Amino acid sequence: MSKLILAINAGSSSLKFQLIRMPEEELVTKGLIERIGLKDSIFTIEVNGEKVKTVQDIKDHVEAVDIMLDAFKAHNIINDINDIDGTGHRVVHGGEKFPESVAITDEVEKEIEELSELAPLHNPANLMGIRAFRKLLPNIPHVAIFDTAFHQTMPEKAYLYSLPYHYYKDYGIRKYGFHGTSHKFVSQRAAEMLDKPIEDLRIISCHIGNGASIAAIDGGKSIDTSMGFTPLAGVTMGTRSGNIDPALIPFIMEKTGKTAEQVLEILNKESGLLGLSGTSSDLRDLSEEAESGKARSQMALDVFASKIHKYIGSYAARMHGVDVIVFTAGIGENSVEIRAKVLEGLEFMGVYWDPKKNENLLRGKEGFINYPHSPVKVVVIPTDEESMIARDVMTFGGLK
């Protein structure tokens, strides 16, 4: 029998939702509530393919959920709130405590709160959503799905930093990795598309959006990933620097008189493509600027692609080879140019890709861009974190 599952991504002043019919993975409706707690909150819901938008004051997440459930009934999406069978909540940080998704109890809620020091901007906001749904829908399973969980299979040699070991033991300082739900979804989908058991595949997953991370997935398990203790580490991103020499932080402080917090703000919000180009963090803008001869925009694109290129080589070495390279997320799914730059020169490791196929895969299309004879397959897969969340609600919420 079909179940209706809500996949939720709660921010401090927003609530993104998708209602999914399982196990068919059929999208029933989706929407977004913005400016929660502020004047003129915006509620957008998709009804029969059309977006319906209303503006009203919404004081908190409980009221937001209430309004969402009322809208479901008003638009005949459900007859009654009891039609909803479970909810799944994206939680950014599960630390070492949560190596997989988990049914939410009071104890789990408390542990997510304790992990807030590892994700102070995200976990408290994710909790607001969890508490609102548990209050208004107390009789159904609620499941937490952690961005970090998929990477908990990394070995010590991948997740430890070369710092005094007691920093790891005392403060939990280690690599955690993020985008786990996306990496898990696309790796499973790649195996399906190849009609091969995931246990037999070495996959390099490139989740490239405004935030970007690369993962080495061996036999379905993450063995390394580019993001670290925080999502600031790894490759160049839209506004994030990615890896830098840590000694640069005190050096910049000394030269500019800025505090550590201010420098961190620069690394998170004023660096990456935006910092390098000086104009935009949006790859589409930079591509246009580069075409019209702006050298710095071209340079930003070159740096961006070269960092990803380097991780692919590194992770192929870690897994003693690679069978599949996956591109996903906004840029990975849509930028013909970045995919081409990243794949350039990888023939030495068995990557032979077809420029024509590459040009044809845009806007949510899925498919292979390698030549048939290529030992390494290259595939573009639109990520679907919400379906992955719904699957985990079925599994961990006891609904199967």
Swiss-Prot record:
It is an enzyme of class 2 (transferase). GO terms for molecular function: acetate kinase activity; ATP binding; magnesium ion binding. GO terms for biological process: acetate metabolic process; acetyl-CoA biosynthetic process. Its EC number is 2.7.2.1. The record marks 179, 240 as: Transition state stabilizer. Substrate binds at residue 90. Belongs to the acetokinase family. This is Acetate kinase. It comes from Staphylococcus aureus (strain N315). The lineage of its organism: Bacteria, Bacillati, Bacillota, Bacilli, Bacillales. The gene is ackA.
